[in-house]
Every structure is written in structure tokens, then in C-alpha cells.
Amino acid sequence: MNKAEKEKPCINQCCDQIPCVHGGTCTESCEDAKNKFNCTCAVGYYGRFCQKRRATSCKEQLRKNKGSKSGVYQLFDPATMTMYEVFCDAVSEKGFIWTLIESFSLRNNHEFEDKAFYKDYPKNQEAFTWGKFRLSLPRMTATANRSTHLRATCNFNTEELKYRDYLRAKLNDIDVMRLNFDGCKEYEFISIRGYNCSNCTAHFVQRDHWHAHTDSVWGPKMGCQFTSQSTGAVKSPNGEDNFGWYQTVNRVHRCTSSDDSTTQWWLGVRRH
């Protein structure tokens, strides 16, 4: 093939049949007899004809790719037609698939302490980091709409799941995406500094300018069933905060044992 033939535009009419779907762009090719066109796919789609859609949730990601393990994945947001990063956990608790909606270090608490979950405060959705991460409100809400449970963990990035300093509840009992509340709520399990309670009521608070958390001093005074965590709690200045807010901290609580300690909040669904 001479130079003139190489520079001649390729026209084989393969793109006339519009083989690329979901907004994909077709380019004709004359260099390979077996591959006469190429599809450049729109964001969120892939495959020979752009016929496959990227996963939009952790559950879908793990279902589409049976070999997928817990880790950071790129998910497709159909509302904005963009990709974003999130940590999916399908291993730590048998029967559950969890989506991380927030993670922050005690050092960065000042950026999260006044952010209720029903407020929009996205952080590092395109470049995941355990020390400062949160999904946007629309993405958290979409995740909540397909979830059944809520949990909070400490230092998951360095220690994985430990049931000391941990909470789990049904979203029907603690609707963290809407709840403006200070009082007793039902938990499936809650543990603070080694004290724990199963299928009981315990303190939960989230206000317009207070991050969701529990208080080991004031909570037991509200008539909740879980009261043993008051033993050894830091009382001054305002009562020990656990899993967020952190105006008064206890170094025995794993989420606040050092400035590099991290707190995670997750939304989850049972695996079927």
C-alpha cells in the first residue's frame, strides 16, 4: 500500500448500520478485514458494541464479577453520567455487602464534625482516601434506597473488621439519611470500649450541625437499654463522643485512639 492509499480515508459503510449503542461513536477501519469498525464508548459503557454497562452499585459490581474481592472500585453514576470511586466490602461480614459512604481520620474531624448525613459534603470521590472521604448526598441517598442496614467501624483500613467499637442497625430503625434526632434507637449490635449490647436500644444523635454519633455519658441517662459504656467514659467537657462529632474523646475508643485513627460509616444489604 503506497502513501496515497494510506492517507485515503477509510469508507466501508459499516458505521451506516449504527453498531455502537448507548451513545458510542463508530469509526470505520480498513486495516483489518476482521475488524472493520471500532466503537468508542460513552462513559459508563464498554464492550465491542458498547452494549455492557458499568456497575452502579457494590452489589452489582460483585454480582457481575464473581471473582471480585473487597476493595476500591469505580462505579457508574447514571444521574451524572460520571464514574466515581468507592470501597466495596463483601467479605468482612458473612451475608452482607457493604458500601462505604464516609471515612475520616481524627486529624480531619474538624471537616466532618458538623456534617449530618442529610447534607451534601462530597470528598475525594474521584481519588479515594481513608483519611478524608465521603460520597455526595445524591449518591449516598441512591445507595440508601437499595440498602437495608447501617454500620460504623473503626480503623477498617488498618485492622479490617473488629467488633470492639462497632455498631450495626437496620435503616428502618435508624434512617441516617433523614434522621434529625437525639434519643434512643434500636440496634442489632453496638460495642463501645468492650461493652456491648445486642438487639437493644442505645443512644443515637444527629442534628443539623452535629455529625451522627453516640454519647457514652448522656446516652445512658436517656433511658436507653445500653448503659454499661458509661463505665470508664470521659465526662469532661461535654461527654464522650463515639463514631463521630468527637468534641470529647476517649483514647481507649479505637476510633479516637490516635490522630491517625479512622471512623467509617457504611450502608449495606444482605447478599441473596
Stretches with model-predicted labels:
Residues M1-H272:
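Mature extracellular or lumenal effector domains of secreted proteins
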